[in-house]
Curated annotation (Swiss-Prot):
Organism: Burkholderia cenocepacia (strain HI2424)
Lineage, top ranks: Bacteria, Pseudomonadati, Pseudomonadota, Betaproteobacteria, Burkholderiales
Pfam families (UniProt xref): Ribosomal_S20p
Claim: Transferase is one of the keywords in the record: no
Family under the similarity heading: Belongs to the bacterial ribosomal protein bS20 family.
GO biological process, one term: translation
GO CC list: cytosol; small ribosomal subunit
Keyword RNA-binding: yes
Protein's name in the database: Small ribosomal subunit protein bS20
Entries under InterPro entries matching the protein: Ribosomal_bS20, Ribosomal_bS20_sf
Length: 90
């Protein structure tokens, strides 16, 4: 248990940051899932639109160091390949 005022404050700050970071990580995963779902449905226009929005979200979260920049780049690359594959199949 945090006994000093400083320790109590750090515990409050950590809880607040954890809550905020969890929400951003959830947003990251949701953006990826929405693009994947559109690709699986075969909706080329929707997939491209969602991909553009997902890239913006992924970059923002990587800039804030919620996820590592390499993980963000890998995610964007895989989504781009999926969207491009959908266009090639059509």
């Amino acid at each position: 248990m945090a006994n000093s005022a400083q320790a109590r404050k750090r515990a409050r700050q950590a809880a607040k940051a954890n809550s905020h970071n969890s929400a951003l990580r959830s947003k990251f995963r949701t953006a990826i899932k929405s693009v994947r779902k559109a690709v699986e449905a075969g909706d080329q226009a929707k997939a491209a639109e969602l991909f553009k929005a997902a890239v913006k979200t992924i970059d923002t979260i990587a800039d804030k160091k919620i996820v590592h920049k390499n993980k963000a780049a890998r995610s964007k690359s895989r989504l781009a390949a999926a969207v491009k594959g959908l266009q090639a199949a059509a």
